[in-house]
């Protein structure tokens, strides 16, 4: 216990280390940082009153910006939610970067406040502090009976039991939501999705609040700060210099088979070049000294894209519905990105030629999150401050400007703006808390996505007995396809689905309703038992599923492949096999089958393995190989032996196909999985080793390094045990890694797609210690190739760390995840530092 306390205190000391160390962690050794700002007449960064700030904005014709709330009513806002009566629940990160070194950032001064407009003039004039004393709160969700609030690493369920808008009860609902560390590199969002789950950025989890408890389910990792959805529940997110990505299918489908991870259908890039067009000089950015970052003193390209929103309101022109608004707080601007869809794939482009939707001449305008409002307008959360960059990445270049231009002064301010279209009157927010279920169902017909979402949430929370019959009618007979879609998901959340409603929805005129029907059919089928009524319900779905499997819409066909494996009903698997044979050229269809067969891959192969078309058709052959690979990765001796028996029973071409699939899984990109130990050589393997076909012989011979027996099955000698000092170093390294490196490289060492390469088995880490030390000391700039994948991002040097901290991090990572490399000593780090002086 004393040792752990000592380690924690060491980390605390590191967090508060001197200016010359911590504040320059963003620097790279030997990199020149010319003071380019001195060549421009940079205006003062004096704080403006909210009214003065209004004059600093330039918004495109047809729009007007208004103050919805402002200091002293708001302090350092980072996120918000509207409740059912139009009140704003704002999350305030009041300890964020209180000075250039971030000293005091661990203070428990954060809060969640409720803002109200009591006189109806459109500006919030009353503040009630719901909960205070929080450390870096970052997300909020309104749920049944209360509010979920994120305070890393805890997700609190907070309740107001007496109606005064102040939390009287605070219960730990989930531990492990967000880690303590760089703000923009930990979980955030808690965005209610169309499918009744809460989605997050910088996260691999989705959450659902049911009966007072938080359910947690794995999903795909996505985004950095902020997450949004469109009218069909598709998710959008971004990451610093990458302003917008879109998932065209629900990410949960891509992770349901741990032995076949895929990002197919995810992360579509929705921008062209990286150019931005700001309204002022932007020399005060972290890497403004780098070529291409500034254009005549103004930010030239995306560097700090933050919480986006997809427009779903009814106050702007209809042609903007589905377009994206993206804030760039480093450039004091907001982009309107026009999104178009063709053949199921999205693309995006700036709505204006070399201009932005909204710009400001005020350097302290920091739009960090955007939202759709009850009135159909876009709302802007402005953190309003000089310092935006977190201490973990501040460069000397930025630090000098912060001090010289007093960007560290005048903190604790904040604004929330509303942008109104001048062509239509803004509607007042409805008071939905007092409305009955019939009135709430009526809101599903609204053209305002916020109203539909809020009505769905309230209907699911209340779960009143009279609502399902009306919702079933809405799901099948409403004139508006969005209402039909929402009604289906509302029924799903209430447990009110039935087979006739789903069957009718599967034949709906609109493809997005058919997609929703397929998805809710999964949930419905999962609730059915073995009773006669439940069996009849399953059977009743088959005709409609058979019909939708012939759908002409490409998006619907993809959803068929994703949903059918999850629907356990008579005749569904044969329907699925026939469907995949017909549409195997679609990679999402192929992956949908493979991920959906998690745990059933062998049985499926046993049914199709002898079929000629599954051997001769290239796309079907790829599926067979992938399924064989899944069985191999399961490392189950019995199932692997059954797979080898299946291979032996096939003609030569079938043997090659299955053996090739096993080999590809056993030796991914040159790496080797841990061998599977058999008591003796499998007879089927011995038989194929005597094959007349040379290719079969080669594949079996290579496989003998993965399937082992006898002397070869003896485990390798374990790595030498760590000494007591090295073990303490390992424990310190684990804490430091989690607080810093783990934000990108992840707790499992698998890295972040498109950004941070995996550390697991990386030769850059477990190879020569000097190489690993050098990377940590100096950083690395891509492109860099790890396990056959190229990564083209930069990792800053960790020059703010002392030698003992670098040694600790490397000792931990070189021994974690079954690594066997030697620990790194402080002396090794010091030697390398001295050699470079």
Which residue stretches match the model-derived regions?
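Bacterial N-terminal signal peptides
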Residues: 7-16
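Beta-propeller domains with acidic blade repeats across secreted/periplasmic ectodomains
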Residues: 24-439, 450, 458-461, 498, ...
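Flexible coil segments in periplasmic/lumen-exposed cytochrome c-class electron-transfer proteins
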Residues: 29-44, 715-720, 725, 786-837
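The canonical Cys-X-X-Cys-His
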Residues: 370, 381, 416, 733-747, ...
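Long, ordered, helix-rich scaffold segments
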Residues: 381, 403-413, 419-735, 752, ...
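Gly/Gly-Pro-rich "capping" loops immediately C-terminal to redox-active cysteine motifs
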Residues: 402-404, 477, 751-787, 792-802
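Detector for the c-type heme attachment site
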Residues: 421-422, 745-751, 777, 781, ...
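Sequence/structural segment immediately N-terminal to covalent heme-attachment motifs in c-type
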Residues: 726-752, 765-778
């Amino acid at each position: 216990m004393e040792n752990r306390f000592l380690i924690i205190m060491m980390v605390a000391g590191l967090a508060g280390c001197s200016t010359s160390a911590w504040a320059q962690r963003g620097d790279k050794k030997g990199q020149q940082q010319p003071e380019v700002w001195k060549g421009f007449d940079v205006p003062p960064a004096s704080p403006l009153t909210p009214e003065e700030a209004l004059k600093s904005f330039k918004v495109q014709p047809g729009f007007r910006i208004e103050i919805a709330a402002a200091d002293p009513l708001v302090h350092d806002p980072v996120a918000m939610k509207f409740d059912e009566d139009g009140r704003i629940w704002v999350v305030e990160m009041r300890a964020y970067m209180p000075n250039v070194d971030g000293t005091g950032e661990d203070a428990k001064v954060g809060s969640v406040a409720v803002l109200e407009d009591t006189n109806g003039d459109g500006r919030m004039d009353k503040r009630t502090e719901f909960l205070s004393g929080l450390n870096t709160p970052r997300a909020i969700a309104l749920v049944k009976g209360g509010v979920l609030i994120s305070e890393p690493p805890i997700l609190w369920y907070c309740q107001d039991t007496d109606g005064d808008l102040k939390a009287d009860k605070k219960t730990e609902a989930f531990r492990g939501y967000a880690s303590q560390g760089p703000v923009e590199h930990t979980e955030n969002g808690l965005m209610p999705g169309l499918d009744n789950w809460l989605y997050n950025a910088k996260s691999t989890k989705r959450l659902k609040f049911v009966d007072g408890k938080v359910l947690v389910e794995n999903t795909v990792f996505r985004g950095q700060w902020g997450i949004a959805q469109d009218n069909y529940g598709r998710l959008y997110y971004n990451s610093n210099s990458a302003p917008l990505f879109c998932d065209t299918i629900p990410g949960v489908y891509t992770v349901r088979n741990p032995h076949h991870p895929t990002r197919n259908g995810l992360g579509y890039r929705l921008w062209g070049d990286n150019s931005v067009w700001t309204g002022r000089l932007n020399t005060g950015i972290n890497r403004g000294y780098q070529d291409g970052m500034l254009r005549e003193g103004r930010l030239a390209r995306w560097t700090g894209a933050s919480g986006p929103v997809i427009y779903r309101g009814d106050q702007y022109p209809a042609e903007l519905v589905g377009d994206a608004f993206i804030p760039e707080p480093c450039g004091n601007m907001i982009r309107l990105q026009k999104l178009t869809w063709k053949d199921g794939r999205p693309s995006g482009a700036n709505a204006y030629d070399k201009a932005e939707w909204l710009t400001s001449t005020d350097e302290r305008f920091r739009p960090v999150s955007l939202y759709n409002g009850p009135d159909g307008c876009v709302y802007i959360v402005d953190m309003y401050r000089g310092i935006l960059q977190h201490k973990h990445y501040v460069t000397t270049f930025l630090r000098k400007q912060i001090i010289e231009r007093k960007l560290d002064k005048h903190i604790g301010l904040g604004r929330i703006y509303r942008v109104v279209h001048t062509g239509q009157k803004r509607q007042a927010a409805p008071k939905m808390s007092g409305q009955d279920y019939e009135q709430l169902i009526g809101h599903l017909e609204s053209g305002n996505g916020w109203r539909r979402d809020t009505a769905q949430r309230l209907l699911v929370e209340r779960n009143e007995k009279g609502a399902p019959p009306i919702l079933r009618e809405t799901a099948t007979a409403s004139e508006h396809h969005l209402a039909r879609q929402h009604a289906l998901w509302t029924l799903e959340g209430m447990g009110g689905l039935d087979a006739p409603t789903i069957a009718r929805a599967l034949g709906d005129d609109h493809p997005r309703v058919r997609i929703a029907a397929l998805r809710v059919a999964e949930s419905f089928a999962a609730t059915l038992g073995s009773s006669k009524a439940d069996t009849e319900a399953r059977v009743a779905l088959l005709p409609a599923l058979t019909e939708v499997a012939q759908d002409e819409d490409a998006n619907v066909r993809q959803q068929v492949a994703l949903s059918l494996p999850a629907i356990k009903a008579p005749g569904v698997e044969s329907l699925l096999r026939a469907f995949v044979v017909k549409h195997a050229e679609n990679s999402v269809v192929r992956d949908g089958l493979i991920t959906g067969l998690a745990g059933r891959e062998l049985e499926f192969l046993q049914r199709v393995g002898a079929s000629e078309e599954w051997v001769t058709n290239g796309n079907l052959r790829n599926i067979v190989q992938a399924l064989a690979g899944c069985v191999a990765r399961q490392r189950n001796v019995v199932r692997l032996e059954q797979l080898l028996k299946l291979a032996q029973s096939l003609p030569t071409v079938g043997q090659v196909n299955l053996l090739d699939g096993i080999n590809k899984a056993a030796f991914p990109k040159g790496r080797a999985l841990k061998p599977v130990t058999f008591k003796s050589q499998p007879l089927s393997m011995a038989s194929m080793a005597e094959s007349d076909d040379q290719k079969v012989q080669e594949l079996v011979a290579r496989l003998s390094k993965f399937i082992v027996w006898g002397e070869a099955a003896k485990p390798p000698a374990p790595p030498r045990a760590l000494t007591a000092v090295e073990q303490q170093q390992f424990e310190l390294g684990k804490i430091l890694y989690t607080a810093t490196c783990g934000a990108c490289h992840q707790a499992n060492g698998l890295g972040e797609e498109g950004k941070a390469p995996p550390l697991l088995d990386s030769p850059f880490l477990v190879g020569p210690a000097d190489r690993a030390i050098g990377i940590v000391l100096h950083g690395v700039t891509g492109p860099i190739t790890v396990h056959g994948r190229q990564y083209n991002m930069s990792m800053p040097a960790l020059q703010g760390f002392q030698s003992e901290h670098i040694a600790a991090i490397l000792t931990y990572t070189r021994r974690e995840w079954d690594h066997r490399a030697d620990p790194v000593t402080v002396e090794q780090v010091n030697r390398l530092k001295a050699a470079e002086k």
